[in-house]
Amino acid sequence: MKTLLLTLVVVTIICLDLGYTEMCNMCVRPYPFMSSCCPEGQDRCYKSYWVNENGKQKKYHGKYPVILERGCVTACTGPGSGSIYNLYTCCPTNRCGSSSTSG
């Protein structure tokens, strides 16, 4: 019984990873989405959008932002970084990267 309990505790700790590993949704244009652990040192998730000449996110059928890429980065350079037609936004949560327009 003690062995079983010890095994369950060890498996739980390994599976939970003690909450230190960031998981980011990865996107291969345009789909499928998959969650993947970020490499060591890259602890922020980001989303990359297409933007128009005014810096506004381009929408698909007027509803959803066109997300080009999602992944892990070492540090965020701040909202709105990237080129004139490509906007990078860091996400505030683990496994972020849904189709919502908020970071």
Swiss-Prot record:
<feature type="site" description="Plays a crucial role in mAChR-binding activity">
    <location>
        <begin position="58"/>
        <end position="59"/>
    </location>
</feature>
<dbReference type="InterPro" id="IPR045860">
    <property type="entry name" value="Snake_toxin-like_sf"/>
</dbReference>
<comment type="function">
    <text>This toxin inhibits the binding of [3H]quinuclidinyl benzilate to the M2 muscarinic acetylcholine (mAchR) receptor subtype (CHRM2).</text>
</comment>
<keyword id="KW-0528">Neurotoxin</keyword>
<keyword id="KW-0964">Secreted</keyword>
<dbReference type="GO" id="GO:0005576">
    <property type="term" value="C:extracellular region"/>
</dbReference>
<dbReference type="GO" id="GO:0090729">
    <property type="term" value="F:toxin activity"/>
</dbReference>
<dbReference type="InterPro" id="IPR003571">
    <property type="entry name" value="Snake_3FTx"/>
</dbReference>
<keyword id="KW-0800">Toxin</keyword>
<feature type="disulfide bond">
    <location>
        <begin position="24"/>
        <end position="45"/>
    </location>
</feature>
<keyword id="KW-0732">Signal</keyword>
<feature type="disulfide bond">
    <location>
        <begin position="91"/>
        <end position="96"/>
    </location>
</feature>
<feature type="disulfide bond">
    <location>
        <begin position="76"/>
        <end position="90"/>
    </location>
</feature>
<keyword id="KW-1015">Disulfide bond</keyword>
<feature type="disulfide bond">
    <location>
        <begin position="27"/>
        <end position="37"/>
    </location>
</feature>
<keyword id="KW-0629">Postsynaptic neurotoxin</keyword>
<keyword id="KW-1214">G-protein coupled acetylcholine receptor impairing toxin</keyword>
<feature type="disulfide bond">
    <location>
        <begin position="38"/>
        <end position="72"/>
    </location>
</feature>
<protein>
    <recommendedName>
        <fullName>Muscarinic toxin BM14</fullName>
    </recommendedName>
</protein>
<keyword id="KW-1213">G-protein coupled receptor impairing toxin</keyword>
<feature type="signal peptide">
    <location>
        <begin position="1"/>
        <end position="21"/>
    </location>
</feature>
<comment type="similarity">
    <text>Belongs to the three-finger toxin family. Ancestral subfamily. Orphan group XVII sub-subfamily.</text>
</comment>
